[in-house]
Amino acid sequence: MLIINDNNLSGPLQRVNGTGELSVQFKDGRSRISRLYQEGAAKIRMPQAVTGPLEAILINTSGGLTGGDRLKWDVALDDGASAVITTQACERIYRSGGGEARIATRLKAAKGTRLAWLPQETILFNRSILSRRLDVELEEGAQMLVVEATVFGRLAMGERVVAARFADRWRVRLGGRVIHAEEFRLGPDVGAELQAPAVAGGACAMATVLMVCEQAGRHLETARAIIGEEGGCSLWRVGKASKLVVRLYAPDSYALRRRLCPLVALLNGKAGLPKVWTI
């Protein structure tokens, strides 16, 4: 276990605690907010959109997380609603002074909905500790696109991650049945572990993309062309729906985005890229 001690710290440290909850309904021909709750550092803003899905931008006003911080997001879509959820900026996980930072996300999508969970990258700094959890509940007939990208240090800033801990847990259910599960862990020797050919082959930026819908297979070949040799794409049948799973890795966040942006634009249909995404 990565243990970090700093004898210069004294007294209780202020911790980040944030909870953001958003419910979306389809009413009068549009997807609209039915419930919004914000607490602590978690804020949610909605750019005005006359047509198309509701777009929500999640904001952590603390500017980043460190050991002991907690951030929770909860998004629910009622029948027929559609929404694109993203973040204002990359989430930053700073050096831990003790304990882990936790990010917990819960998504629910009723029948006939389309939900896109598209946060910008999570950046881990040296000696950071992060536990990230994603729980998704889909009803039959719901469509979903999920992207989670992680970057270990910013090479352009001369940053390298040698020691850190990262745990990423996913559970996705369709009609009450688990159709996708992940238990990804790195650390404490992240720098060495990322060099392993079976892990990242020296890359420090990676992303997982998951699409669940009836016709996910139509994107398979185009997605593979975008991904190239630094990643992979597979298609699975899950009952009446299909599941497209993409893994990407790159030497830095810029190289990752150059492929992730066109991939998201492809899979997100007419909604395309969130307005806040840039290369």
Curated annotation (Swiss-Prot):
GO terms for molecular function: nickel cation binding. GO terms for cellular component: cytoplasm. This is Urease accessory protein UreD. It is found in: Cytoplasm. UreD, UreF and UreG form a complex that acts as a GTP-hydrolysis-dependent molecular chaperone, activating the urease apoprotein by helping to assemble the nickel containing metallocenter of UreC. The UreE protein probably delivers the nickel. The gene is ureD. Signal peptide: none annotated. It comes from Brucella suis (strain ATCC 23445 / NCTC 10510). InterPro entries: UreD. Keywords: Chaperone, Cytoplasm, Nickel insertion. The second copy of ureD in this organism is annotated as a pseudogene.
